Amino acid sequence: KPKANTPYYSATIRIKKAKKLEAKGKIEKSKKIYNEALKYLYVANKEKPFDPDILNYLGFANRKTDNVKDAEMYYLMGLEIDPTHNGINEYLGELYVITNRIGLAKERLNVLKDCACDEYQELKDVIDGVKKSKY
């Protein structure tokens, strides 16, 4: 759990808020909040570089603001540090699905196959077309 009153904490609060707005179909409003989160995440990344959780959220918030190239870069940086990070593997897999790189998405799924985690099923459902990416 992130420490209160840190840039990372401030970013996570905004990401949760943006996800709620997105779930209600308020996409443009959610993108503004994701952009606010990014400002905090860039500061957090400067203060604590090489933190896979920060890199995961940098990838996530960039993807949510349609900046797929930067999102992929941050996800890949995070995987260099922690190749089995569940969140990064799921979200990068979803990015690969939305950019029509199913083979790469399946590679991420393969990494998650033994994790006994929600991320495996979430990504599998997105790859199989059972559901659209929740995030």
Give residue ranges: language-model regions.
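Terminal, low-structured helical/coil segments at or just beyond the last alpha-helical repeat
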Residues: A4, K106-Y135
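Structural marker of alpha-solenoid helical repeat scaffolds
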Residues: E47, I81, L112-C115
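Residue-level recognition of tetratricopeptide repeat
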Residues: D51, H85, C117-Y120
